[in-house]
């Protein structure tokens, strides 16, 4: 019985060992299978990365030099020369024409077809163009044009722009001058969500860079504009054109150019509303930025386009009486800001170097809702130029604050003044004429009278406020300290 029991137990042990070995082999096989599956997935992803490698795209636009791959169109496939030796205008225009025919049933703004994010890929090439690259007149939206150089040929028309967005339905769109109405009125939108990215536009001293008319939500990002004679970027009507991370200059320079006094052209001209210019450098042009519309925002811009001494203007705010503009955190490098009858304009957190300043130019003599605060100014102490100056008379001034700025080598100007006058006598004169911005305008004043060594109350009063001078007099002679605070702030309708 014992022998039989041991025999049964032995068989059970062998069976159990065999079963365990089988299970171990099965687990290893499953684990191996999972590893192979993951390896296969990784290999597939790697092949996909290789298939869409930028180097592969640069080597060949598509299989056998195809014109497109998916929804990406290649001007090289249309006969464009990426080496920049042969004329490529027609190739790029053909690629654009085909891209604008890839339309979905979706619309963006009314009448603007959604093109589904089609891309015109310049593939890092340099393309010589003899005529403007004008987007199809049919209009459209959701398009990207990226990655290359457009170079104007010797025969490029000097009154046109390298890239143009305008429809024949836009009134006056073919007039690319900078004439403008008093009010910007939109008549229709034909292009929307068009993105220009990583493009160098070299106008070869013939015409301008990009011309945009009656378009909405256009992005010009990380682009370089060079050798323009009219405008680097000109926008008419429409709204919400975003210009960011761009460099613009008529001449290649990093400052101190011997030919600076001869710089011409305008880097950015916006005859449009609700636009933003962000993180942009303007290194050579007669005028850096012209703002002719309302509700525009300029922030983080460095202007050293042409020194004020040579007649240059950094930022020109036009549309007198309707400006509604914000200029924030800008670096005005030897070139300043001119504002025509500014209304609701905000200039803050800026740095003005090399006697760069702010000039208020009178058109109808109005300034309202102007804030110039928290800026730094640096200039030549031998000149001591004012940080803010007036060009003309301003009889209509209200809600203006120029304060909390600091200056080194320049004269502070403010709409708020504080002075302390000491003296032994009957009259104390606080002269604010070298401090206050507007002449002969003190809207509010306060004063305190401290008589030293006197125990009795003395009669004293303000006897005159004129020509930005406050006079305080006492009934009897006394050794006193008089502190006076004034401001030029008034609200509409306030009687002074």
Q: What kind of region is each of these model predictions?
A:
Residues 2-141, 146, 150-197, 253-256, ...:
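Extracellular "leader-to-stem" segments immediately downstream of a signal peptide or signal-anchor
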Residues 47-65, 360-369, 373-413:
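Small/polar residue-rich beta-strand/coil "junction" motifs that cap repeat-based extracellular fibers
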Residues 92, 97, 130-135, 156-187, ...:
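Extracellular beta-strand/beta-solenoid scaffold signature
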Residues 142-149, 190-203, 216-227, 239-257, ...:
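Right-handed parallel beta-helix
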């Amino acid at each position: 019985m014992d022998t039989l029991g041991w025999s049964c137990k032995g068989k059970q042990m062998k069976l159990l060992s065999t079963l365990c070995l089988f299970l171990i082999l099965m687990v290893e096989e499953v684990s191996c299978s999972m590893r192979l599956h993951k390896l296969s997935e990784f290999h597939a992803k790697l092949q996909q990365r290789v298939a869409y490698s930028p180097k592969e795209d640069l080597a060949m636009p598509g299989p056998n030099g195809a014109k497109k791959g998916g929804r990406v169109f290649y001007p090289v496939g249309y006969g464009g020369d990426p080496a920049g030796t042969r004329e490529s205008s027609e190739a790029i225009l053909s690629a654009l024409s085909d891209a604008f025919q890839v339309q979905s049933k979706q619309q963006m703004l009314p009448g603007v077809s959604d093109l589904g994010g089609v891309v015109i890929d310049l593939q890092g090439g340099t393309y010589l163009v003899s005529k403007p690259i004008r987007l199809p007149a049919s209009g459209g939206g959701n398009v990207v044009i990226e990655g290359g150089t457009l170079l104007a040929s010797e025969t490029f028309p000097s009154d046109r722009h390298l890239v143009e967005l305008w429809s024949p339905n836009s009134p006056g769109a073919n007039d690319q001058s900078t004439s403008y109405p008093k009010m910007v009125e939109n008549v229709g939108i034909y292009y929307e969500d068009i993105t220009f990215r990583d493009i160098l536009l070299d106008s070869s001293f013939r015409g301008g860079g990009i011309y945009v008319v009656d378009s909405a939500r256009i992005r010009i990002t990380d682009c370089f504009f060079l050798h323009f004679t009219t405008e680097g970027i000109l926008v008419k009507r429409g709204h919400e054109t975003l210009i960011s991370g761009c460099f613009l200059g008529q001449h290649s320079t990093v400052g101190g150019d011997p030919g600076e006094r001869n710089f011409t052209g305008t880097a950015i001209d916006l005859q449009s509303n609700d636009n933003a210019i962000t993180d942009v450098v303007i290194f050579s042009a007669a005028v850096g930025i012209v703002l002719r519309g309302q509700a525009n925002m300029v922030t983080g811009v460095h202007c050293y386009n042409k020194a004020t001494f040579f007649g240059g203007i950094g930022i020109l705010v036009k549309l007198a009486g309707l400006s509604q503009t914000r200029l924030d955190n800008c670096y005005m490098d030897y070139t300043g800001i001119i504002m025509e009858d500014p209304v609701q304009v905000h200039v803050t957190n800026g740095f003005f170097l090399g006697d760069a300043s702010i000039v208020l130019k009178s058109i109808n003599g109005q300034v309202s809702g102007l804030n110039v605060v928290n800026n730094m100014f640096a200039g030549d102490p031998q000149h001591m130029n004012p940080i803010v100056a007036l060009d003309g008379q301003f009889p209509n001034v209200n809600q203006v604050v120029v304060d909390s700025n600091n200056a080194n080598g320049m004269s502070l100007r403010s709409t708020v003044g504080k002075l302390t006058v000491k003296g032994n006598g009957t009259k104390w004169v606080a002269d604010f004429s070298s401090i206050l911005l507007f002449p002969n305008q003190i809207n509010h004043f306060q004063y305190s009278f401290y008589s030293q060594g006197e125990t009795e109350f003395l009669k004293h009063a303000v006897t005159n406020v004129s020509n930005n001078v406050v006079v305080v007099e006492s009934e009897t002679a006394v050794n006193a300290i008089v502190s006076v605070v004034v401001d030029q702030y008034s609200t509409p309708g306030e009687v002074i």
